[in-house]
């Protein structure tokens, strides 16, 4: 059913769909659908992706079920990015993924580039084109203390499965906060290490922050 839904989205978007896949770390998400978190590994994910690719190729998965449509617009199916944050999962995904779409908590571009280098080497060893290298981070625009407090509040709300004292301990160094100019400088640092794409995760429902980011990104050379 997921393969069918993704193929349909690819068709409706004219072949512009990119899919992020990850095992996730919130056990309640698995409980909500009756899945066992212990079975959700990168290796199991590879098996599921293999089935989806067979569906997209028009193969019969079982003798009793006809091929499932529609066919995706993109040959072989939509681009798949693995939500990997470590070297082991990155290497294991090289056989089937088209790149990375993880998250950086502390915005350390040196550490991020080390993971990108692992991906570059793994994709080359697998005989595949260079990987798409995406990452993401939470952000808040504004005066330093107010923006950092905004990120902290968001983390407290979002990470409600983690003890509050743990969230409070990680909040000062998790995500990004600062001025418009500082955000542009940060994005340029990620561009310098070959980042293909940065997903900026809002920490406020204030649409003005999203509009400001859109203007800033549009002005980056």
What is the predicted role of each segment?
Residues 1-221:
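Active-site-adjacent structural elements that line small-molecule/cofactor binding pockets in enzymes
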């Amino acid at each position: 059913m997921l393969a069918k839904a993704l193929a349909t989205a690819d068709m409706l978007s004219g072949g512009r769909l990119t899919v992020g896949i990850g095992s996730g770390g919130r056990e309640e998400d698995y409980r909500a659908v009756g899945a066992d978190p212990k079975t959700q590994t990168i290796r199991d994910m590879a098996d599921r992706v293999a089935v989806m690719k067979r569906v997209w190729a028009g193969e019969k998965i079982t003798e009793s079920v006809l091929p499932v449509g529609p066919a995706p617009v993109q040959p072989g199916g939509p681009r798949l990015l693995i939500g990997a944050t470590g070297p082991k999962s990155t290497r294991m995904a090289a056989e089937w993924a088209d790149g990375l779409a993880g998250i950086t908590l502390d915005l350390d571009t040196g550490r991020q580039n080390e993971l990108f280098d692992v991906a570059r080497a793994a994709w080359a060893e697998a005989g595949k084109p260079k990987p798409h290298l995406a990452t993401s981070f939470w952000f808040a625009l504004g005066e330093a203390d107010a923006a950092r407090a905004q990120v902290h509040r968001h983390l407290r709300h979002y990470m409600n499965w983690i003890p509050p004292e743990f969230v409070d301990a990680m909040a000062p160094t998790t995500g990004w906060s600062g001025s418009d100019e500082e955000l542009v400088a940060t994005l340029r640092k990620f561009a310098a290490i070959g980042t293909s794409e940065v997903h900026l995760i809002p920490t406020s429902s204030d649409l003005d922050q999203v509009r400001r980011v859109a203007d800033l990104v549009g002005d980056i050379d």
